[in-house]
Amino acid sequence: TARKVFDKFDANVNSLLRNPNRGILDSDLSDSQFTVRHLQLFPNVLYYVVKGDSIIISAVMHYKQSPQTVYKTVMRSLERYR
């Protein structure tokens, strides 16, 4: 159900508060300003950045999205933080 999906998502996001570096480092999306990490929340992937004491969730996308679509989406969402 939608509630179960939300609860799982919420628990994973809250776990980032305790361990922000638990996600997998995504070197293809990282640059000198941002270290992008991702969590696999099947069938979705959550892309995020730790910046100071904040966690910026840049995208939540279905795992079948093309690498180009993921790159464009994540980069576009991080533009406002540059």
Regions found by a protein language model. Give the residues of each.
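Enriched for short, Lys/Arg-rich terminal
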Residues: 41-45, 49-82
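Basic, Lys/Arg-enriched alpha-helical interface segments
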Residues: 1-36, 68, 76-82
